[in-house]
């Protein structure tokens, strides 16, 4: 969060940065296969109903890159809109869509691989120690999509350490 003051529509300005590393754990030498960098700046809005938090919505400008140049580059920018809604104590849904900003000839087919929207559903047990999630990314073709399945388990109630596994 960049400011504590409220902006119009009770929004706030924030920055984000994520980095994803893709590993091939079955390979003995050089198991790291790919890196992905994703900085962004956005406006956020908490969704409150009857004095209770039920979700959040974001409007962002994001950059995504594998850090390479020339023909190996997968760099692109996008304007994204996303929301997350808490359905009850155990279930949450998320949705994210984007408008790509593609610069000329570079990566003009990026939507073929990175899609046009994502939808996720997460389940968390009442004691908040086990969480299961599924994320579907719709690619350009109507019946083409990527799926991620995630499982995390919190070892100790008092610690913030998890066992996490993801299938992509």
Predicted regions and their residues:
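Outer-membrane pore/translocation modules
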Residues: 5-144, 166-167
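Predominantly the C-terminal beta-signal and adjacent terminal strand-loop region
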Residues: 142-168
């Amino acid at each position: 969060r960049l400011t504590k003051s409220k902006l119009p529509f009770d929004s706030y300005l924030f920055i984000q940065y994520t980095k994803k590393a893709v590993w091939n754990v079955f390979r003995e030498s050089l198991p790291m296969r790919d890196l992905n960098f994703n900085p962004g700046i956005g406006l956020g809005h908490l969704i409150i109903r009857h004095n209770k938090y039920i979700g959040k919505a974001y409007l962002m400008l994001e950059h995504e890159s594998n850090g390479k140049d020339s023909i190996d580059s997968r760099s692109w920018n996008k304007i994204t809109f996303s929301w997350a809604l808490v359905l009850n104590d155990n279930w949450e849904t998320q949705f994210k869509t984007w408008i790509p900003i593609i610069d000329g000839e570079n990566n003009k087919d990026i939507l073929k691989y990175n899609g046009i929207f994502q939808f996720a559903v997460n389940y968390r047990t009442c004691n908040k120690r086990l969480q299961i999630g599924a994320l579907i990314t719709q690619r350009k073709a109507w019946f083409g999509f990527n799926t991620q399945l995630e499982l995390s388990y919190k070892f100790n109630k008092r610690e913030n350490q998890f066992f996490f596994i993801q299938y992509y």
